[in-house]
Amino acid sequence: MDLLDQGVPLHAVGLQSHLQAELEIDTHGLAEFVAELRSWGLEVLVTELDVDDQKLTGTPAERDAIVAKRVDDLLTAISTSGPVRSILTWGISDRYSWINGTFARKDKQPNRPLPLDGEFKPKPFMDVISKFTKDA
Protein backbone atom coordinates (compact mmCIF):
# COMPACT_ATOMS: atom_id res chain seq x y z
CA MET A 1 0.00 0.00 0.00
CA ASP A 2 1.54 3.30 -1.08
CA LEU A 3 0.94 5.23 2.15
CA LEU A 4 2.47 2.52 4.32
CA ASP A 5 5.35 2.07 1.86
CA GLN A 6 6.06 5.80 2.19
CA GLY A 7 6.21 5.53 5.97
CA VAL A 8 2.96 7.38 6.65
CA PRO A 9 1.88 6.48 10.21
CA LEU A 10 -1.37 4.73 9.35
CA HIS A 11 -2.79 2.56 12.13
CA ALA A 12 -6.44 1.91 11.34
CA VAL A 13 -9.20 2.14 8.77
CA GLY A 14 -12.76 3.06 9.68
CA LEU A 15 -15.49 1.44 7.61
CA GLN A 16 -18.42 3.85 7.36
CA SER A 17 -21.37 1.53 7.67
CA HIS A 18 -24.58 3.21 6.55
CA LEU A 19 -26.45 0.06 5.51
CA GLN A 20 -29.66 -0.41 3.53
CA ALA A 21 -31.85 -3.03 5.20
CA GLU A 22 -33.29 -4.32 1.94
CA LEU A 23 -29.84 -5.04 0.48
CA GLU A 24 -27.77 -8.05 1.44
CA ILE A 25 -24.10 -7.53 2.22
CA ASP A 26 -21.39 -9.13 0.08
CA THR A 27 -19.97 -10.86 3.14
CA HIS A 28 -17.34 -12.80 1.18
CA GLY A 29 -16.00 -9.67 -0.52
CA LEU A 30 -16.08 -7.70 2.73
CA ALA A 31 -14.27 -10.46 4.63
CA GLU A 32 -11.53 -10.57 1.96
CA PHE A 33 -11.16 -6.78 2.01
CA VAL A 34 -10.88 -6.68 5.81
CA ALA A 35 -8.38 -9.56 5.81
CA GLU A 36 -6.23 -7.64 3.33
CA LEU A 37 -6.33 -4.50 5.48
CA ARG A 38 -5.35 -6.52 8.53
CA SER A 39 -2.53 -8.21 6.60
CA TRP A 40 -0.99 -4.73 6.31
CA GLY A 41 -1.10 -4.40 10.10
CA LEU A 42 -4.10 -2.08 10.13
CA GLU A 43 -6.85 -2.16 12.73
CA VAL A 44 -10.36 -2.18 11.23
CA LEU A 45 -13.01 -0.08 12.97
CA VAL A 46 -16.75 -0.06 12.31
CA THR A 47 -17.90 3.55 12.12
CA GLU A 48 -21.14 5.41 11.46
CA LEU A 49 -23.18 2.21 11.76
CA ASP A 50 -26.89 2.52 11.11
CA VAL A 51 -29.39 0.62 8.97
CA ASP A 52 -31.97 2.45 6.86
CA ASP A 53 -35.17 0.39 6.93
CA GLN A 54 -37.37 2.78 4.93
CA LYS A 55 -38.02 0.23 2.15
CA LEU A 56 -38.91 -2.66 4.45
CA THR A 57 -42.50 -3.68 5.05
CA GLY A 58 -43.83 -5.47 8.10
CA THR A 59 -44.21 -4.83 11.78
CA PRO A 60 -41.55 -3.00 13.76
CA ALA A 61 -40.45 -6.37 15.21
CA GLU A 62 -40.09 -7.88 11.73
CA ARG A 63 -38.13 -4.86 10.51
CA ASP A 64 -35.94 -4.92 13.64
CA ALA A 65 -35.08 -8.57 12.95
CA ILE A 66 -33.94 -7.75 9.41
CA VAL A 67 -31.94 -4.74 10.63
CA ALA A 68 -30.24 -6.93 13.25
CA LYS A 69 -29.47 -9.54 10.59
CA ARG A 70 -27.74 -6.94 8.41
CA VAL A 71 -25.63 -5.81 11.37
CA ASP A 72 -24.82 -9.43 12.24
CA ASP A 73 -23.81 -10.12 8.63
CA LEU A 74 -21.54 -7.06 8.62
CA LEU A 75 -19.85 -7.87 11.93
CA THR A 76 -19.52 -11.57 11.13
CA ALA A 77 -17.74 -10.76 7.86
CA ILE A 78 -15.40 -8.31 9.58
CA SER A 79 -14.66 -10.73 12.43
CA THR A 80 -13.54 -13.60 10.18
CA SER A 81 -9.96 -12.28 10.23
CA GLY A 82 -9.90 -10.87 13.75
CA PRO A 83 -12.07 -9.48 16.51
CA VAL A 84 -14.30 -6.45 16.13
CA ARG A 85 -12.73 -4.07 18.64
CA SER A 86 -14.66 -0.88 17.94
CA ILE A 87 -18.23 -0.21 16.83
CA LEU A 88 -19.43 3.37 16.51
CA THR A 89 -23.09 3.80 15.68
CA TRP A 90 -24.31 6.97 13.97
CA GLY A 91 -26.47 7.83 16.95
CA ILE A 92 -27.85 5.62 19.69
CA SER A 93 -31.64 6.08 19.59
CA ASP A 94 -34.09 6.06 16.70
CA ARG A 95 -35.60 9.20 18.24
CA TYR A 96 -32.66 11.32 17.11
CA SER A 97 -31.56 9.52 13.95
CA TRP A 98 -30.71 11.63 10.93
CA ILE A 99 -32.41 8.99 8.78
CA ASN A 100 -35.89 9.93 10.02
CA GLY A 101 -35.38 13.51 8.89
CA THR A 102 -33.87 12.55 5.55
CA PHE A 103 -35.56 9.35 4.37
CA ALA A 104 -39.21 9.27 5.39
CA ARG A 105 -41.06 5.98 5.13
CA LYS A 106 -44.06 5.91 2.80
CA ASP A 107 -46.18 4.35 5.58
CA LYS A 108 -45.36 7.33 7.85
CA GLN A 109 -43.86 5.01 10.50
CA PRO A 110 -40.52 6.10 11.95
CA ASN A 111 -37.40 4.41 10.67
CA ARG A 112 -35.70 2.09 13.17
CA PRO A 113 -32.00 2.38 12.22
CA LEU A 114 -30.22 2.31 15.58
CA PRO A 115 -29.64 0.03 18.62
CA LEU A 116 -32.23 1.74 20.84
CA ASP A 117 -35.81 2.58 19.88
CA GLY A 118 -37.43 5.99 20.26
CA GLU A 119 -38.04 5.29 23.95
CA PHE A 120 -34.39 4.28 24.46
CA LYS A 121 -35.24 0.59 24.81
CA PRO A 122 -32.77 -1.92 23.33
CA LYS A 123 -33.67 -3.66 20.10
CA PRO A 124 -32.17 -6.80 18.50
CA PHE A 125 -29.53 -4.52 16.92
CA MET A 126 -28.14 -3.96 20.45
CA ASP A 127 -28.03 -7.71 21.07
CA VAL A 128 -25.87 -8.13 17.98
CA ILE A 129 -23.46 -5.42 19.14
CA SER A 130 -23.25 -7.11 22.55
CA LYS A 131 -22.49 -10.44 20.89
CA PHE A 132 -19.47 -8.99 19.09
CA THR A 133 -18.15 -6.79 21.90
CA LYS A 134 -18.58 -8.98 24.98
CA ASP A 135 -14.90 -9.96 24.95
CA ALA A 136 -13.50 -6.69 23.56
What are the language-model segments listed below?
Residues 12-16, 45-48:
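Short, conserved beta-strand edge motifs with alternating hydrophobic and charged residues
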Residues 8, 17-20, 90:
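His-enriched metal-coordination microenvironments in redox/metal-binding proteins
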Residues 2-8, 14:
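Active-site cradle of extracellular carbohydrate-active enzymes
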Residues 2, 26-86, 91-136:
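Aromatic-rich peripheral "rim/lid" segments of glycoside hydrolase catalytic domains that contact
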Residues 15-24, 61:
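Surface-exposed cleft-lining segments at the edges of enzyme active sites
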